[in-house]
Amino acid sequence: MLLYFYLVANLKILIITQKKSKVLSTLLESKEVVGIIEPREDKHLSSIVEKAIFKNIKSVAKKYHIPYLLMKDRKQNILDWIRDKNPDLIVVYSMPFLLKEEVFSFPSLGTINLHTALLPKYRGAVPIFWTYYYFDMDTGVTVHYIDKGEDTGDIVLQKEVKVDFGERYYELRSKFEEIGAVAILEAINNIESGKANRIKQSIDSPTPRAIRVKREYYIELIDWNWNLERIWHFFRGTENYLKHILIKNKFISKIFRIEIGKMEIVGHNFVIGSLHKDVNGKFIACKGGKVYYKFKLWNPEKK
């Protein structure tokens, strides 16, 4: 463990994020933010609507009178814009691609990232998905420096997050953001006061890379031999992926979402993985019972 000592008056921070979150609001309320960059790589209809209407980062920047830049793809040159703002530290949360070295190495104090897992576990783009997949109930957040690798930089600090059985994705995400906001603020304060830890990560991760999951791969990932409790928990955490199985029409899938309801431990003769309906509603036949689901109108707060 090493301690790096810097003394910076009025630390200037630049934020890179694609989420209007507790993390963003905490930084805006407590630190000197000199710029916000919003990377927007996802071109799906629901994502565009969500970002443009429900989670408009540009409007937040305008409210706080902070310079804003939309980063439309990973090839866009953002270094000149960053140079003009001259931040001491860049803070990243929810970034769809890796930053170039010329960017993350520009600030005098470097660039830190908030990752929703206890590194070196679940390095990659979607750690929360894989937390559900591996039925991992003990997770957390990591604030780490960005280097050339994917989530491999030195760790500043970590905080634990407990996953409740059957907790939905958006509920767990809210937990991550609450604890993550505390963690990122603590990390910045430590860096600002010259008391930040830099803990080297192990080269190898105990888990496979937390890759993005496409429709076809999600279907392949479902292990119908899992017991009912595990598959129900997995479905509750991946409702947005389940719609690719349960809603065949692509346009309809943009309007509706899936909400997983209760599970029922019961014997049956249905084919495992098949869809049915009884007096209690629609259900998926699983090993050892049924998992009920409903169609709900799309809601960006439950995405």
Whereabouts are the PLM-identified features?
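One-carbon transfer enzymes
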Residues: 1-242, 246, 275-302
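A conserved acidic, glycine/proline-rich C-terminal tail/linker
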Residues: 264-277
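Short leucine-rich amphipathic alpha-helical surface patches
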Residues: 235, 239, 259-264
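Short, structured protein-protein interaction patches enriched in aromatics and acidic/basic residues
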Residues: 247-261
